[in-house]
Every structure is written in structure tokens, then in C-alpha cells.
């Protein structure tokens, strides 16, 4: 019965193809038309420049940079060839470098020759306890004063520094710094005289390290210090230990 009932409907659909479309197909087509197309994130290869053009652009930039450098070098060379003062400065600089190399080579050769012909011995200078105490105290004082000078110069860069710290440091450091005022002209409003003050203070510190060294006596009779005596004794013992295995092997 159901098959016979559906036969007229099927015949009507075949005979009338332009009949009404079912609701399922209408909703499906409307869903496709309303859904927006998703664009891909891949770049468009047609908009990108070809690789050959990029390489050519980089090569052209490199060539232009090299040519500009060569032109600038030629300009400097021509300017230097026309300026006798610059030529004299270059000549003096080259001669100074040659002289420094010769002095360094001569000192190296001399040290090697001395070390090869003579035995090296390190002796602590000084044999007086009082001299060592005075020298160490002076060295410590100069090092502390150097640190105070550094702190004083650093605080000059901070205008809002507390006066309770700045005033004592100014009382200690300004008399020494004022000695060197005016020796070096200021450069762009910057006072460079403290550089000379630090150089002199470092020279004093280096000189203080050599104060406990002993000087030879005027009559010519030199009595060895206790450190020298200990070193000679140690050297004799080491040489005796070195010769002992050789004598045992000969027996």
C-alpha cells in the first residue's frame, strides 16, 4: 500500500524536474553562502621580489660601500701627501715604534743572557724591623689617602651629596688637589688636574715600597743581611742534595 502511494509522487518528480526543491537542500545551500571563506596566512609569492633581485641588490650595495671606502682612503692619502706636518707626524710615529721594538728586543736579549749565565736568587730587601714598620705604615697611609681622593672626586658628580660627608673630605683633599690646579688646562669645562695629582701620589707610593732596602756601606766591607745568609744556606743545602744522587750512582 505504501509503495503504491509513493508511486504517484515519484512520477510527478520525474515528469516535473523544475518542481519545488526540498527544504534540506535549501538550508544546506544557504549555510554555504552565509559561511565566510577563511583566508590562508600564506604569503602571496607573486608579491615577493625574486631571489636574484635581492642578491643583486646586496651585491650592488656592497660594491658601492667598497668604492666609497676606497675614495675616502684616496682622499685621506692625497690630503696627507699635501700636508708636510702630517707626514712628519707619521714619520715620527713610525720611528718611535721602531725604537720601542729595538729597546724591547735588546732588553729581552739581555735578560736571557743574564739568566743563562748567572743563577737567579731572590732576596728580601731590608733587615731592619723599624724600617719595615715605617715603610709599611707610609704605604698604608698613601693607599688610604688615594682612596679618599677617589671618593672626593666621585662625590663632585653628585650636587645633592650630604654636607656631613663632603665637608670633611674637602678639608682633607682640597689642599693637596689645589697644588696641581692650573697645570693642565680644562677640557670642555672638565678639570683634568686630578690626573696629575694621582700620578704624583702613585710615584710616592712606589718610592715608599723601596724605603726598607739596604744600601752598601761606604767602607766597602759589606756584611750580609740575615735574609741573604738564610738564602745562601738554603742554596748550599739544595746543591748538596742535587749532588748526592750523582755521587751514589758513581759508587
Curated annotation (Swiss-Prot):
Residues 232-251 are annotated as: Disordered. It comes from the Eukaryota. Its main location: plastid. The chain crosses the membrane at residues 119-139, 183-203. Residues 232-243 have a biased composition (Basic residues). One of its GO terms (cellular component) is chloroplast thylakoid membrane. Keywords: Chloroplast, Membrane, Plastid, Thylakoid, Transit peptide, Transmembrane, Transmembrane helix. It is found in: Plastid, Chloroplast thylakoid membrane. InterPro entries: CCB3/YggT. Disruption phenotype: No visible phenotype under normal growth conditions. It is a multi-pass membrane protein. The keyword Ubl conjugation does not apply. Residues 1-51 form a transit peptide. Not required for the biogenesis and accumulation of native cytochrome b6 in the thylakoid membrane. Not functionally involved in the pathway for covalent binding of the c-type heme to cytochrome b6. Belongs to the YggT family. This is YlmG homolog protein 2, chloroplastic. The gene is YLMG2.
